[in-house]
Every structure is written in C-alpha cells, then in structure tokens.
Amino acid sequence: MSGRRVLALYAALLFGFAGVLCRLFYLASRTDYAARAAAQSTVTLELPARRGGFYDCMGLPLTGLEKRWLALCFPGQENYTRLYACTDTAGQELLYRSRSRAAPFLVEVDRDMTALGIPCYAASRRYAAAPLCPQLLGYLDGEGHGAAGLEKALDALLTGSGARDTLLCPVTAQGNLRTGEQVQHLQADSGAVGVRLTLSRSVQRAAEAVAAQTMTTGCILVLDVRTAALRACVSVPGFDPADPAASLEAPDSPFLNRALQAYAVGSVFKPVLAAAALEAGLAPEYDCNGAVVVDGQIFRCAGGVPHGEVDLSAALAKSCNGYFIRLGQQLGAQALLQQAQALGFGRSIGLAEGLTAQSGALPGAEELTQSGQLANFSFGQGSLLATPLQVSAMMNTIANGGVYRAPCLLDCTLDETSGEELSAFARPQAERVLTEQTAAALRTMLEQTVAEGTAQDASGLPGGAAGKTGTAQTGQFTAEGKERMNLWFAGFYPAEDPQYTIVVLQDGQTQAAVSSAAVFAQLCTALHWLG
C-alpha cells in the first residue's frame, strides 16, 4: 500500500473518532437526554392506598388501630438475611422469590428498621387482631375496595380518587441505590375522608365482651335513648375481616348481621298491644286459667300455668298469652296494625345508602280477619317478623316518652389530618306516636316485669331496669326433634333516667346457657362502671 493511501486511511479513522467524541459530548451536554437516562434507572414503587377510616362518636378510631411497617429492600444477601427474621411467612416467601431480583421491592416487617439502615414506611393495618363490629363495618376485596357493610356502602367517600404515595428509587444496573442519591417519597392526595359513626368504642367493646362470654348465636344492640343513635351493634359468631375467606365454610353464618335480619318475635311484641290499649283507654281484667280456645284452637300460656285474675300490668309482667289474645280481640285488627306501624314494625330502617335492615313482616288486615291469626298476632306469633333494630326502636320510643326515632348510625365526614367535621349526615325526624302518659305507664309496667315478672334475671341493677322477655317459636327443629326458639330481651337502663335501650336476641336456640335478660344485666353492669 502506498504511503498516500495509508495517510488517507489514518485521516479517515481520525475524523471518525473525532465525530464519535463530538457526538458523545453533545449527548452529555443535553439535559433532556440526561433526564431520560436517569428515568430509565429509577424504579417507582407504590405504597398502599390511604383509605378513610371509621371513627366512633368521640372521634376514636374503629379501624386502623394497629400500625404496620413496609421495608424498602434493595438487592443483597445481607438485606435479605436481616429482614427474614422480621417478617411473616408471606414476607419470607417474597424474600426468597426475590433473592435474585435486580430491583428494590417492599416487604412488610414487624418493626421500624430505619435506624438499622433499611428505610421503612408506616401504614395502618385496616383491621385489628380483635376487630370491632365486623358485620357492620364489613371488609375489603382484593383491590382494596369495600365488599360488604359500611365499607361497601361508603366506598366512594373512603376511597376518593385512589391515588397512592409513591417511592422513586434511583438505582444502579444491579438494582442498588445509586451512590449519593436518596429515595424520594411523593405523597398523593386522594381526597379520601374519614367517617364518624354514632357508635361508642367503649360500649361496643363492652357489648362484644359480654356476647363472647354468654352467647353462641345472636346479637346485641345498644341505642342512646334521647337520639336513637346506635352505640353498639354486635352479631355473633363473628369473623376476621382481614381474612374473610377463612370463615367461608364456618357454621352459624358468621357474615350475617343478625341485627338487620327479620325473626319471629314472640312476647317482646306485647308492649305494642299494651300501648294500643292505653291509647284507647282500655285496661280490662281477665281471669287466666292457663289456656284460651279460639275457634277450636287452644292457645296456652307458658307451661299451661294459670295466672288467675290479672290486669294489664300483671299480664305484661307474667307474659299472659290468654290476656293479650282477649285484648287483641277487644281492640281489633285495625287498631293493632296501626299501633305496630306507628312503632316502626313493617318498615325498613336504612343505616346508610346501600345498607338497610330488612322490613320484617306484618300480617295483612285480611289475614287478621281469621280469629286464629289475630290470636297469634296478639302475642307476637304467626306471620309477624321483625328485626332486632325494629324492636329496639319500639322499646326506645317507650323509654323516650313516646317519641319515635328511627335508629341512626352515620354522624359526619371528617378531615383525618385535622379531625375537622366536613359535612353532617341527615338524621331521621322525630315523631310522637304515644302520649307521655301512655309511655310513662308502660315504663312502670316494664319495671314491674323486671322486678316481679318473667324478666327477673335483669333485676338488682343500680338504678333499676325495665324490659320484656320473649320466646318465639320458629317452626324449625333439630335432628332430635327439639324446636329452635328465638330468645329475646328488650329493655332500657337505668329505669330511673333511661340512658340506653338494649336488645338481646339469641336466635335458633333450644336452650341458652345464659338467658337474654341475664345477658342484658351483664351489659348494664359494664355500662354502669363505664359511667
């Protein structure tokens, strides 16, 4: 090769190399290219969505009571080893699967490890190990949206836009944090709000503790007498809202909110007839021989025991079926239906949009033209069905001087950062349905029922108590041929100045270990000490 050709070749190589250097210099000087390169080596991680919480009437949290920690794990056997002992089985499996991963990830740990050089971020655990009112609050689906209860009914408020906080992690090709740089925590405002309920956390805890000790199936409701605000709602058995799948095959329907379901009522309905009689100016006497015959059908008092000469007060205290059958005949079907409807039977009670109690069932006027059906209705049997929520509203009307209020649950929405009230939920209107004189007379009769009648298991409380028992036939039998009963107690406490209306139902029982009146008494004792 001639010298001239060699020189030309070297010149070409030199110019080519110079061009490459110029291009590299150009690229390095362009900030947009630098930004793109940085973005390509930045890993973005999302933290769990911030969901609005539930709060009690005093602003105390009902959800998010426990904190959990999410550790930001960068590749490296040392990090995996340090985290392995601080996480649960699911976290350990994640660490094992990610041992060869070239990118950071989040894993839940049981403590804050920031001081040990592992960045950690706090998040609330939605449901505590001992969750409160799971059937009422509900639970979330796999996407973090409400699947049942108030979680579902108020999902839009609690979720907001669903925007999540993010972590921007500048990493090397191996997935480690780049030297001299830090993780950026970008906080998002989803617009989610908290919801304050009328529940009282302390009353709810007390009711749940009593139910756990005394009941296998059933519910307990507690209302504030003056406002009909729901202070506690317990349904047993319960379930873990953090792991609802674990209870899918569990017996006795743990997902069922028994407070909102309709049941056969029994003698706890008798105050309705007593109210109708007092409003009509009737207070007859009756000589009970233990049974009454209506169109050839025999209706017996409990155990067929005669009560002798009884007036309205004694008949209510002794739960005399014969007296109330005769009273129903004297009042007539129309008067009974009107009184029952005025006290809330036969109409549903909405606690939130999308969360409504069953309406129950009132017999029709035509059905009650049959004397046997009227007799059944007069002591709370037959086709009559009612929810514990309806029964609580009826008893609360008596305790509140004859003023009916539908029970309510929602108070207002909250700014969770400041605790400031944002907007109040509408409350049901009050309606006088009994005269003050009728309500006062019924309160005295119900006090006597506890002091001397069928509800003596609720006697001896400080300040006294008042209420009515009920044992309702269901027409359902066990394999051994024993009929399942619904065992009720509805009353208020203290009798001298009622603060709480309480309903206890044990459903589908053949024989309860503790009577519903005794369950009521245990809860009243707890409420007395709460002050």
Q: Where are the model-predicted features located?
A:
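Beta-lactam-recognizing serine transpeptidase/beta-lactamase-like catalytic domain environment
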Residues: 61-63, 224-267, 275-508, 531
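Periplasmic/cell-envelope proteins involved in peptidoglycan metabolism and beta-lactam response
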Residues: 1-245, 337-342, 505-531
